[in-house]
């Protein structure tokens, strides 16, 4: 019973936080630090409650965020923002290593699909807010990540 309440709380909280991140980043091009902090706290509590591996949470924290940090440094902050790095780091605590990689791949997929459409509809907006796409990838992975990973691994030849 309590475990079910925790799962409901976790899904609702992550959904609200991702909506907040999406709207704030879309409007003002910044990812709220408090949302990242709360997401990290939920990830830590979830890893304790569900008895997930600390190694997986730590790897999830570093794998994608390190790649984004390299991108940030190599473009001198013009290619990606620090808030996007923070968001993917703390989502790694919640999703684990494979889940965070999947969330990032889904976000990149949505950018590739939706960015040309956005360019046609809103040609005056030059900058791209990555937060909404990252949030979508995080939410989809949070909801169906294990199913997506299992479906991928069950393909013949993999």
State where each predicted segment sits:
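A membrane-topology feature that recognizes alpha-helical transmembrane segments
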Residues: 1-158
């Amino acid at each position: 019973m309590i475990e079910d309440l925790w799962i409901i709380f976790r899904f609702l909280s992550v959904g609200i936080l991702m909506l907040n991140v999406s709207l704030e980043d879309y409007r003002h091009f910044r990812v709220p630090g408090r949302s990242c902090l709360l997401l990290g706290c939920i990830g830590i509590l979830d890893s304790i409650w569900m008895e997930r591996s600390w190694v997986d949470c730590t790897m999830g924290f570093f794998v994608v965020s390190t790649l984004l940090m390299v991108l940030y440094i190599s473009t001198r902050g013009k290619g990606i923002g620090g808030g996007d790095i923070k968001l993917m780091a703390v989502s790694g605590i919640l999703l684990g290593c494979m889940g965070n990689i999947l969330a990032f791949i889904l976000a990149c997929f949505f950018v590739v699909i939706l960015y040309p459409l956005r360019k046609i509809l809103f040609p005056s907006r030059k900058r791209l807010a990555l937060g909404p796409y990252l949030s979508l990838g995080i939410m989809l992975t949070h909801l169906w990540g294990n199913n997506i990973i299992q479906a991928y691994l069950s393909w013949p030849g993999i």
